[in-house]
A protein has these predicted regions:
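Nucleotide-activated chemistry modules centered on ATP-dependent adenylation/adenylyltransferase
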Residues: 1-40, 45-212
């Protein structure tokens, strides 16, 4: 399959239309990178799925930042209103797994092979949890970011889904003004919006930019 030509948003819309016609409400394990990015995705997908938000981000640095972000995620879920149930599941904050994956890639630019490995690490854990929990689908909020390559994310997600035996929900949440809406929702709910992706390497790069 040539994923280069796939319009992920249209593929998602086709599925959602079919689910409505069949009057089905599947279960979805939604990997969330942070509360702001999840805000629009939850507003959108909770119209069609029973969702469990899976917060698994061992890349986040420092630990105080991890704590801040996970608390914001829980706060958002508690305050938003959904058509179908949305629950929360915290993954293990296992930084060693991230650093093991990133070994030798410390100097790679953001958006390169280190980031691809980070996506795969988090999506594999998500797929494993989805299988164990009997979920119909799994996906991630990551494609809402203008900085994230939706094609790469979907390629990794599909491959991981095939490996683990669970359906990956194709998506490009930045489409249809998804990113803009996430900013609006962040304001409505008073969410903390970080200025770096999450890992130690992106944190240090951001600090260096601020010093210029």
């Amino acid at each position: 399959m040539n994923l280069q030509k796939i319009n992920y948003q249209k593929e998602l819309e086709k599925l959602l239309t079919r689910l409505e016609k069949e009057e089905k409400v599947p279960t979805l394990l939604l990997h969330s990178c942070c509360a702001p990015c999840s805000s629009y995705v939850l507003e959108y997908l909770s119209q069609y799925f029973k969702i469990t938000v899976f917060y698994y981000n061992p890349n986040i640095y420092p630990e105080s930042e991890y704590t801040k972000r996970i608390l914001e995620q829980q706060k958002l879920i508690e305050e938003m209103h959904f058509r179908y149930p949305v629950s929360f599941l915290a993954g293990k904050y296992d930084r060693d797994r991230f650093y093991e994956m990133a070994k030798g890639l410390e100097e790679v630019r953001e958006g390169g092979s280190r980031c691809m490995g980070c996506y795969e690490l988090r999506l594999k854990e998500s797929a494993e949890i989805a299988v164990a929990g009997g979920f119909d689908y799994f996906t991630t909020t990551l494609s809402i970011s203008p900085m994230k390559n939706a094609q790469k994310l979907n390629e990794i997600g599909q491959r991981v889904g095939e490996e683990y035996g669970v359906q990956y929900l194709l998506s490009e949440f930045k489409k249809k003004n998804g990113y803009k809406r996430s900013i609006e929702l962040s304001g409505i709910y008073g969410l903390y919006r970080q200025d770096y992706c999450g890992c130690e390497f992106s944190y240090k790069a951001r600090q260096a930019e601020k010093r210029v």
